[in-house]
Amino acid sequence: MFTEIVTLSALVKITLTMIKEHEVLVIDDFISTEYQEQIKNTLIGEALFNGHEFPWHYIEDVTACGDHDSQHRPALYHQYIDFINEDQKPVVDSKFHDLFVPLLQRGSFKGLGTTKVNALQGRSFLQFPLNLKNYDVDNPHIDLVEGHKHIVVLYYVCDSDGDTIIYNETKESDQYTVKQRVTPKQGRVVIFDGVLMHTAEQPLNNTRCIVNYNLG
């Protein structure tokens, strides 16, 4: 089994630029090709990780969890770390969390200036093309409770459609203005200030698979 090891010399190659307020960083080939393939083959292939097959779970709504005004677009989901509330330590829910530690060390170094990984929440989503009645984007949201300072490390497992859309707004709004759109590409990571509202387009042509962690 391939194992990614993050060394100091490898981190030196990553320009250290701590995330500024409301900043968005998009970096291609953030991890080695071998590591990219390991993640892809584990999540959407047939590879085992430490002898275990990756499990997916059904959710009825990919962003809003069944809110009445949401698009109710189903997906598959896997939770690595559960954020309960600000007063309790996040809980590691999955043995597959270890697969992403090297990725998160790089993300933490790039976004926070430290290799120490303080993961507050971690999830993956797997979306399939749908026959849509409308093409509205999924509900804009933030990943954690409002006011909880964190960065988002969003990794794309494979090439697909279904852009990530990051807005200028930091609170719910009747009208959103687009700050940046990012197209899913294998090996690409998006690191941004977690206060920014964001969402994703529903894929129409390809399977969309992401790894989403919130670091503090």
Question: What annotation goes with each model-predicted range?
Answer:
Residues 93, 97, 101-216:
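Catalytic core of non-heme Fe(II) oxygenases with the double-stranded beta-helix
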Residues 5-7, 11-116:
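Non-heme Fe(II)/2-oxoglutarate
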